[in-house]
Amino acid sequence: MAGPFGFRENPHPKEEGIPPMRIYARASIIDEVNFDEMFLVTMCGMHFYKDMFGKAYPFRKYDQVFVPEHNYGAMENVGCVTFNENYLHRGETITLAKRLRFAGTNLHELAHMWFGNLVTMKWWNDLWLNESFATLLPFIAMIHSPRLAHFQPTCWVTFMQYTFWGVSTDQLSSTHPICTEIVSTDQAESLFDGISYGKGSAFLKQLYNVLGHETFKKGLHYYFDKYQWGNTTLPDFVGSLNQAWTESGDTSMGSEFDLPTWCDQWLKTSGINILEPVLTHNAEGHLESLKIKQTMGLRGNNRLRKQKISVCLFEQDGTQHIVSPVIVNDLDGTSVVQIPSGLNIKAVYLN
């Protein structure tokens, strides 16, 4: 970078596992930067990713630069991430929502130091593996970082904006599978869309839910141990997670469940699924039975998919009862939910 930039250095340079860090901005606007929060978010991310991936931050320094007229929101150059100056929100009231959004972008670019730079996709077919992971992991990092507790109450609400982007894109005639065939680099630009970011990260969130935190983390350790400083494909990634899943002995998805096949259902086909609660009430008007009916959207490959969800039951006074896990099968698309007896349920939420 060249130009009239000023910078601040990390005031906590001796914190274990943290490389030298600087934040740069044009000297004329440098006072607009919230240095304390940026350094805090970055350090929390480095600690969490080290634990999650089994590898410390892999480069010698980490600089972050606010650039005028940046073509993109941000770019994950090795050891020198660049951000559009619009993230400074100059002259605006800086709300918690805006701070959370930028913290997510900060952690997104930091995640690329592992997913993208330490391990790189072999070809554009697997662009989603870079972008989907870097979209989901910031929110898991916030939940597991006590020093970022101020973001935790609403961080998943912010994540849902990416999911809605994916849902809307997946209902267009131009939709495509998350992992799709790309024949040239010219075609690759079209993949930077709601499918690669939104639907892909939503799939990974369900994958994280299926495996559980510790098994998911163990699979990522296998992945980075084997493929660091190399190029990978979808089977490499799924194989590492499947190794951890098999070792866990978990049978919550059923004895016939095969993780690679399930991943292909989601990654290699397009289109949404719709889950609808079907309610039956007794003579007193109380909920007696609940079935979940799965149907297909109008666009895409039109297929049912196995899903692991939670169901929240609400009583009149707002008391919540969570039934989890609930497995929605991919054969007839229905699932029966066991309702606790003696409850006067007034609302049902499928998650």
Model-derived features: where do they sit?
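Structured beta-strand-rich cores of soluble
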Residues: M1-E16, V326, S341
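Hydrophobic alpha-helical and helix-loop surface patches within well-folded domains
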Residues: R8-K293, L298-G300
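Beta-strand-rich binding/interaction modules
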Residues: S255-P260, S270-L350
